[in-house]
Amino acid sequence: CTIPLARGRSRSANVEATLEEAKKAIAGGAKEIVLTGVNIGDFGTAHNETLLDLIQKLDELEGIERYRISSIEPNLLTNEIISFVSTSNHFMPHFHIPLQSGSDDILKGMRRRYRTDLYRERIESIKSAMPHACIGVDVIVGFPGETNEHFNETVEFLKDLDVSYLHVFTYSERENTTALRIEDVVPMEAAFDVNGGVPIEVTPAPTPPSFTEPPVVPSETP
C-alpha cells in the first residue's frame, strides 16, 4: 500500500480539538458526523488518547442525531469500541472493516497486521452485540502471488461471514511499495476477470429508516 508512504507518520488532532470541530458542525445544522481518516483506529496515540476516548465524549454532545465511524482496521477495532457503540445514544451500528483477502498467506504478503481468525472474531463480536449492524468489507483481488486457491479461500471466507456489502478492488501497482518485489504478478486481465466474477451473496443492509434514525439503546431487563 502506498498510503503510508504518502502520509508519513500517523498523526491526528486531540480529543478537545475534535470536539470543538464537532460542536461547530452541530451549530451549523449537521445531522450526521462521520469520523474519518487514513487510519482512524490510530487516533490520539501522540496525545496519549484513544478513539474510544473520542467517541465517548462525542456521544455526550447535544444537538446531533447520529455519528458514523468510517473504515477502521480490524486490529484497531477493539471490543471496547464495539461494546460502546452497541449502547451509545448517537453512534450508528455501522462498521466498514477492510479485509483485503481471506487467505492468511496473502495477508502476510500484504504485511497486514491481522489474520482471518482475528477478522472473524471482530465480525462475530459486532453481531453478538448488534445483530442488526451493517458491516461493509474491502477486498483486493489480483495481489502478486495470489493463486486460484487463494482467491477461493477468500470467497469461502466471505460466504461464511455475516456482512452486508463488499467493496472489491483490483490490485494495481504503486511506486516504491514492497509489493513490486513480489514475483508471480497476476495479469491485469485475469485480475479484472476475477473482480467481475466474485460469486458472493451477502446479508442485505438494514432498511433506510433503521439505518439513518438514531440508534435505539436496548433497555435493561428488570
Regions flagged by a language model, labelled:
Residues 1-16:
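Canonical Radical SAM [4Fe-4S] cluster-binding loop centered on the CxxxCxxC motif
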Residues 9-10, 42-44, 104-109, 175-182:
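A short acidic, helix-capping loop that chelates divalent metal ions and anchors anionic groups
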Residues 21:
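S-adenosyl-L-methionine-dependent methyltransferase catalytic core, i.e., the SAM/SAH-binding region
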Residues 27-151:
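Conserved SAM/AdoMet-binding glycine-rich loop
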